[in-house]
Amino acid sequence: MHQVISATTNPAKIQAILQAFEEIFGEGSCHITPVAVESGVPEQPFGSEETRAGARNRVGNARRLHPQADFWVAIEAGIDDDATFSWVVIDNGVQRGEARSATLPLPAVILDRVRQGEALGPVMSQYTGIDEIGRKEGAIGVFTAGKLTRSSVYYQAVILALSPFHNAVYR
């Protein structure tokens, strides 16, 4: 059984990690241990590089806390141009997989507040009245009328980031 350290305690992210690992390695093939670690970037990262740096930092910090694991996984959400997205970073001590998620264009009324220094999650909670929306369906669920959720979009990115770990051509 793979010991997987999730560098987050966010339920939407943990669900995506678990589903993706079980899709690739088989149901019941992994045990997820969530840990809260620092990203080393602002609460609301801007741009692809800052967001990816946050995910990489979280993986490194999780690895230092739990060096005995088989995999360390981080999902860092950010804002790039007029959209929200995330970076997924997965490390197994030998190689790393990284993938960027799909992007969701955000309306100006939301972006204006985020650009003024507020984080997307709290802005969306105020807009929708849903407490801790970032730990649930997120802006993605709201603006896709529930057709997608944070977790479903993250799931795809985790699957992509896992590609180097089960395809020999990457080695």
Curated annotation (Swiss-Prot):
Query: What cofactor does this chain's UniProt record say it requires?
Result: Mg(2+); Mn(2+)
Which top EC class is named for this enzyme in its record?
hydrolase
BP GO annotations: nucleotide metabolic process; thiamine metabolic process
Query: Which positions in this protein are listed as binding Mg(2+)?
Result: E38, Q68
Pfam families recorded for this chain?
Answer: NTPase_I-T
Q: Where does substrate bind?
A: T8, T9, N10, P11, A12, K13
Enzymatic reactions: XTP + H2O = XDP + phosphate + H(+); ITP + H2O = IDP + phosphate + H(+)
Q: Which UniProt keywords apply?
A: Hydrolase, Magnesium, Manganese, Metal-binding, Nucleotide metabolism, Nucleotide-binding
Q: Which GO terms describe its molecular function?
A: ITPase activity; metal ion binding; nucleotide binding; ribonucleoside triphosphate phosphatase activity
Q: Does the keyword Metal-binding apply?
A: yes
- Cofactor, free-text remark: Binds 1 divalent metal cation per subunit; can use either Mg(2+) or Mn(2+).
* EC code(s) of this entry: 3.6.1.73
- Taxonomic superkingdom: Bacteria
User: Is the keyword Ribonucleoprotein assigned to this protein?
Assistant: no
Q: How does it assemble?
A: Homodimer.
- Family, as annotated: Belongs to the YjjX NTPase family.
Q: Which NCBIfam families does this entry report, sorted A to Z?
A: inosine/xanthosine triphosphatase, PRK05074.1
Q: Sum up the protein's function in the record's words.
A: Phosphatase that hydrolyzes non-canonical purine nucleotides such as XTP and ITP to their respective diphosphate derivatives. Probably excludes non-canonical purines from DNA/RNA precursor pool, thus preventing their incorporation into DNA/RNA and avoiding chromosomal lesions.
Name assigned to this protein: Inosine/xanthosine triphosphatase
Q: Which organism is it from?
A: Salmonella paratyphi A (strain AKU_12601)
